[in-house]
Design a protein with these regions (language model features):
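C-terminal ends and interior cores of transmembrane alpha-helices
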Residues: 76-89, 295-309
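Transmembrane alpha-helices of Major Facilitator/SLC transporters
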Residues: 50-53, 256-280
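Conserved MFS/SLC helix-loop-helix module at the cytosolic interface between two early adjacent transmembrane helices
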Residues: 51-89
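Symmetry-related core transmembrane helices of the 12-TM Major Facilitator Superfamily/SLC fold
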Residues: 157-175, 379-397
């Protein structure tokens, strides 16, 4: 079977894999299985702990043996985890499945962005990321409508369907996904499997230590991870147990949460479209400025959501958080990929940023869960919002120096 062009496959995966299964999962766990705030946060902690342990090793696998293989394994694993979450009912089994999801996700993280960057080149990947984001919004909206429609009848069935879609996507990638940009070491230079993996890791580590902006990017990823876990795990519970949802029409909760996501994605679609038109004229400093702006919106909206008791204001705040995240992601991917000039370690370096985010989430998750249990969900959300503030300082530092860190640039590059 003839393989498709890389951009066609990438846009197709953005369309199919953007189905927001996590929305119906969150409502299912709170409404049907009655998870406590601590259990919800522990799920995230289990996921992030596995990401912390395996993010970089699986990135090394992708750089050593191929990004396509890594992605297929990852899609099969995350799809299986979603499907089983819809089958079992034990809280601790579900916590374990969240850990499995995290492990499978590490095979995707880094490898996904590295694959398309190598296929199209660093000079073209920025517009591809932005256009892919627009495909993901369309796929998410269509998928959300389908999942919400199914979820109003059975949340369990909607969760299972979301997992099945990922498994089907993995099987399609086996036959349709190309890989022409990746070059494995020549057979004459290959050594044992563990030796090859270790060589890739050491090369990536030296590259990061010698790249000042990458060190700062990893710091930002750590701070964002510290902040995000509270909102990711507690936003639905905050609405359902504290703030309440509008009663007009008596819509089920899953419909409301689906509507929030749809509105945010529609805004994101048009904002990203506007950015795409002038993106090729934007340098690193311009991207950092946009990231600073949307990070400020993210922090302010998350804090407002934590403190308000009004359903209307809470909805506006959640939309602010979701819109900021929608727009920031393709900008972040482009900014990071611009700094990774060595294709042979691209997936590993990208995985390092993912590992920093996971460390932040795993470290902050249990603490914020205890705060939410002891002092209320709003307190956990507020602390999470305040933890985002150091990221603004790091972005501001990058802006003052045109996207570079001059003090670090004076350090000598490590010898090989």
């Amino acid at each position: 079977m003839k393989r498709l062009p890389a951009t066609t496959v990438y846009y197709g995966m953005e369309l199919l894999l953007s189905m927001p299964t996590f929305i119906v999962v969150a409502v299912y766990l709170v409404r049907d299985l009655h998870f406590s705030p601590l259990q919800l946060v522990l799920m995230g902690t289990a996921m992030e702990a596995t990401v912390f342990l395996f993010e970089v090793p699986t990135g090394v696998v992708a750089d050593t043996y191929g990004r396509r293989l890594s992605l297929i394994i990852g899609f099969l694993g995350t799809g299986t985890a979603w499907l089983l979450v819809g089958v079992v009912s034990s809280p601790w089994l579900i916590v374990g499945l969240w850990g499995l999801w995290g492990l499978a996700h590490t095979f995707q993280s880094g490898a996904y962005e590295a694959w398309i960057t190598d296929e199209v080149g660093t000079e073209r990947v920025g517009p591809v990321f932005l256009r892919g984001a627009r495909f993901s919004y369309v796929g998410a909206i269509l998928g959300l409508v389908a999942l919400v429609a199914l979820g109003t009848q059975s949340l369990r069935a909607a969760v299972i369907a979301g997992g099945a879609i990922e498994i089907v996507t993995a099987l399609a990638c086996i036959f349709l996904m190309p890989e022409t940009g990746f070059r494995r070491r020549p057979a004459a230079e290959r050594k044992g499997a563990f030796t090859e993996l270790r060589m890739t890791w050491h090369t990536a580590a030296r590259f990061v230590r010698a790249a000042p902006l990458l060190l700062m990017i990893i710091g930002i990823a750590l701070v964002v991870g510290l902040s995000s876990e509270a909102f990711d795990r507690l936003q639905e519970a905050h609405f359902l147990r504290d703030v309440g949802l509008p009663t007009s029409g008596q819509f089920p909760a899953v419909v409301w949460f689906g509507a929030f996501a749809v509105v945010a994605m529609m805004f994101g679609f048009f904002v990203v479209g506007a950015l795409q038109k002038r993106f090729e004229r934007s340098g690193t400093g311009r991207i950092a400025k946009l990231l600073f702006t949307f990070t400020a919106l993210l922090a302010g909206s998350q804090l407002l959501f934590a403190l308000t008791g009004s359903p209307v204001i809470a909805i506006g705040a959640v939309l602010g958080v979701l819109i900021a995240r929608q727009v920031m992601w393709p900008l972040w991917l482009t900014w990071v990929n611009q700094q990774v000039t060595d294709s042979s370690v691209r997936a590993t370096v990208l995985s390092m940023t993912g590992q920093a985010d996971a460390i932040g989430q795993a470290a902050a998750g249990p603490v914020l869960g205890v705060v939410a249990n002891a002092y209320g969900i709003s307190s956990g959300l507020a602390v999470g919002a305040l933890l985002l503030l150091p990221a603004l300082g790091l972005y501001a530092r990058a802006l003052r120096h045109g996207g570079r860190e001059p003090e670090l640039e004076e350090l000598p590059a490590p010898s090989s």
